[in-house]
């Protein structure tokens, strides 16, 4: 149990351990000594998931960089881009499998070509060729957009996606779950309630998802906290979230970031990043077991420090991350299993390779330091 409590009130600590943290408690913890918050979060982590730190050998596959959206935080979208063919997607999935991947994360933009049939063909093809690969794909926004193009309900779209072989839905397109914020940074996306409804429908259809928060732009501290509490309320109802992934906004090469920098505001500080990870652990205690410290946003060293602040997962090998790179990310696109093991052991913890659903898997090619030739290089697709 957490015992050093010189400034945190006893009732706040008691509620944290019971999974009853309030918004007022969270604000108080953030206003206090950050290292006391980190210690509390770290103890809650230990009591929930122990000392194992997980990671997944996976690959991002970006099927297109075209998008009709108008998100102000995006530096990846282009009107004249590529669309990968099914054959090219299968080639990338095959490269990933040879590198020991157990998951492919299929991502893209919103394009008129991408109706439900578009995604069904991709998912069915990948699953037929690589039945043991977990397919983690589509955001709530993509599901809504594709369902609309196909003239069907979100529920029917989710049913068909699951039947085709979709294993897990991404919890992206959440950004900040505040309609005030969304009208500024992503006015063309689904609103907060639509995101909640889509995620809830996915969980009820038997499709698990992760959850995300993209912070550090125009939102207030209270809006950040409200977002995490919304995640908690959904989890109380469905139990379908596997994790929370806090993702700091990268304010480079995009309109929102340009305005921020012009006003003298830059990316989040390391302390701010660690505080959000820690307070997320406190708020979500007993509900969402896994909190990820994403190395591609935080950098490897800060991600390692986050393991002492409530995080218990380092994310995936990725093999490519075009979205972060386009927004000025400088932490690379690939971490080998061997380096993950090194980082985790260096933090005094026990490494554990996992799959998308946080099930332990036997280490595959754990000593591979470099990706296979061709990984991280996106070919221009022919499907347009």
Curated annotation (Swiss-Prot):
Organism: Methanosarcina barkeri (strain Fusaro / DSM 804)
Family: Belongs to the radical SAM superfamily. CofH family.
Amino-acid positions noted as binding [4Fe-4S] cluster in the UniProt annotation, renumbered to this chain: 67, 71, 74
UniProt cross-references to Gene3D superfamilies, sorted A to Z: Aldolase class I
Subunit structure: Consists of two subunits, CofG and CofH.
PROSITE patterns (UniProt xref): RADICAL_SAM
EC number(s) recorded for this UniProt protein: 2.5.1.147
GO molecular function annotations of the record: 4 iron, 4 sulfur cluster binding; 5-amino-6-(D-ribitylamino)uracil--L-tyrosine 4-hydroxyphenyl transferase activity; 7,8-didemethyl-8-hydroxy-5-deazariboflavin synthase activity; iron ion binding
Catalytic reaction list: 5-amino-6-(D-ribitylamino)uracil + L-tyrosine + S-adenosyl-L-methionine = 5-amino-5-(4-hydroxybenzyl)-6-(D-ribitylimino)-5,6-dihydrouracil + 2-iminoacetate + 5'-deoxyadenosine + L-methionine + H(+)
Annotated function: Catalyzes the radical-mediated synthesis of 5-amino-5-(4-hydroxybenzyl)-6-(D-ribitylimino)-5,6-dihydrouracil from 5-amino-6-(D-ribitylamino)uracil and L-tyrosine.
Cofactor dependence: [4Fe-4S] cluster
Disulfide feature: none
Keyword ATP-binding among UniProt keywords: no
Keyword Iron: yes
Pathway connected to this protein: Cofactor biosynthesis; coenzyme F0 biosynthesis
Protein name: 5-amino-6-(D-ribitylamino)uracil--L-tyrosine 4-hydroxyphenyl transferase 2
Sequence ranges assigned to domain Radical SAM core in this UniProt record: 53-286
InterPro entries, A to Z: Aldolase_TIM, CofH/MnqC-like_C, CofH_family, Elp3/MiaA/NifB-like_rSAM, F420, FO_synthase_su2, rSAM
Domain of life: Archaea
Keywords: 4Fe-4S, Iron, Iron-sulfur, Metal-binding, S-adenosyl-L-methionine, Transferase
Family matches, as SUPFAM superfamilies: Radical SAM enzymes (SSF102114)
Cofactor binding notes: Binds 1 [4Fe-4S] cluster. The cluster is coordinated with 3 cysteines and an exchangeable S-adenosyl-L-methionine.
